[in-house]
Amino acid sequence: MSKLGALLIICLLLFPLTAVPMDGDQPADRPAERMQDDISFEQHPMFDATRRCCNAGFCRFGCTPCCY
């Protein structure tokens, strides 16, 4: 029984419960903060206003919608 307890203590020290994301950490629970961090695609520096989309090379950097 002491071996099982020692194993449990070692596991809790290596993988604390605080490392697991809690429900309050989800971005869906904080829509105001999520909207402040969200950049509109029209305001993205790599957005092509004449074609109304981003070149395919810039899509890797988070620019959407993509022109293919």
From Swiss-Prot:
The keyword Disulfide bond applies. The modification 4-hydroxyproline is found at P65. Transmembrane segments: none annotated. GO terms for cellular component: extracellular region. Keywords: Cleavage on pair of basic residues, Disulfide bond, Hydroxylation, Secreted, Signal, Toxin. Expressed by the venom duct. Both hydroxylated and non-hydroxylated forms are mostly and only present in part 2 (proximal of the venom bulb) of the venom duct, respectively. Residues 1-19 form the signal peptide. This is TxMMSK-03. Contains 3 disulfide bonds. It is found in: Secreted. The keyword Signal applies. Its main location: secreted. It comes from Conus textile (Cloth-of-gold cone). InterPro entries: Conotoxin. The cysteine framework is III (CC-C-C-CC). Residues 20-50 form a propeptide. GO terms for molecular function: ion channel inhibitor activity; toxin activity. It holds the Pfam family Conotoxin. Disulfide bonds join C53-C67, C54-C63, C59-C66. Belongs to the conotoxin M superfamily.
